[in-house]
């Protein structure tokens, strides 16, 4: 089942966005869908550029690797979405490949895919190995 979290304002409790982990085996065929997840997110435009999504994504990765026992997480962004690219880079993901994709309304985009394995996350984040 997907794990989805609301991102709320610390001050007002207002909804700012959401971040989630969806079971998927698209990137690492050697891992089951329970060992890897796709990370997705959205953030309301007024909250862009304040580090909100990077903080939320970092905490979701910690949850995924520590609590769910994931071996890998992957994510993607359209090639024109530089803000999403920066979130992904700040979280330690590594580039995998780019391919053309078509969304649900029929728009074609170049989609850039990234992945992060547990051992890479541990090294990048400075977290200690967990039991």
Language model: regions and residue ranges:
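Acyl-donor (CoA/ACP) binding surface of acyl/acetyltransferases
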Residues: 4-131
